Amino acid sequence: MIFLTLEHILTHISFSIVSIVITIYLMTLLVHETVGLYDSSEKGLIATFFCITGFLVIRWIYSGHFPLSDLYESLMFLSWSFSIIHMVPYFTNHKNLLSTITAPSAIFTQGFATSGLLTEMHRSTKLVPALQSQWLMMHVSMMILSYAALLCGSLLSIALLVITFRKNVENFGKSKSNPFLIGPFSFGEIKYVNEINNVLRNTFLISFRNFRRYQVIQQLDCWSCRVISLGFIFLTIGILSGAVWANEAWGSYWNWDPKETWAFITWTIFAIYLHTRTNKNLQGINSAIVASIGFLIIWICYFGVNLLGIGLHSYGSFTSN
């Protein structure tokens, strides 16, 4: 009973901290001179990491197995993975663009895990025979870590597309409304001095904003590639370890189970993404489009089988209890 109480306390503390972190992020968007608040939000997500770590350790102790046997535990582990990804740039003293992705992702996954939809899964149960293997920790942890990294990288790519599209729309609108920026100057009388000053000022502001957006786009592109590359490595390890485990449990390395099929599709999509990164003509928007497609594929792979409750991996589904 004490373990369940500790679980309950830790999950609610971590969820509350993440909620506060997101509130602080919103405040920093409104008020830029809040370095102290921003640093507090960074440390807040680190505190969330330790709370979820405590939850996983406690659940591991009293259940007797690694806490990745059902959807509830995997969602908590996914939230824990988002926290890890968040801490990497923080401790390497890089500008943490991931924080705008990891914090909302953590609160979304943890909020869904602790919601009433998964109440029956909150109490740990005995492992089904298929999961009673030392490969459980290796295979499932690698897959969840890959989902977290690939989701973060894909969201960064989606942000890149949004900023690029918005920039193009704004430039088109400004070119329509400001003839000084696209056509010959029509200066008549003595007002031409003021008109020239206005044109130069507008041109400078537009150039500065475009330069800042260019920098943000380049950073988003760089970080999305890094995070997706890491996630692709985890995904490859997870699929290979799962194949070995499947051979031990079911006598075959690959069965084209729905989960296996969508994992292969996910791997293929992000392999295409990494291939586009090797071609300079396909980098940027083209590779971001591929990553955006991958974002949808990951959710189908992660939740699709769980919603349907079919195939060899149905023990982690909503209908398994």
Swiss-Prot record:
It is a multi-pass membrane protein. The keyword Lipid metabolism does not apply. The chain crosses the membrane at residues 9-29, 44-64, 71-91, 97-117, 143-163, 227-247, 261-275, 288-308. Keywords: Chloroplast, Cytochrome c-type biogenesis, Membrane, Plastid, Thylakoid, Transmembrane, Transmembrane helix. One of its GO terms (molecular function) is heme binding. It is found in: Plastid, Chloroplast thylakoid membrane. One of its GO terms (cellular component) is chloroplast thylakoid membrane. It comes from the Eukaryota. Disulfide bonds: none annotated. Required during biogenesis of c-type cytochromes (cytochrome c6 and cytochrome f) at the step of heme attachment. This is Cytochrome c biogenesis protein CcsA. It comes from Nandina domestica.
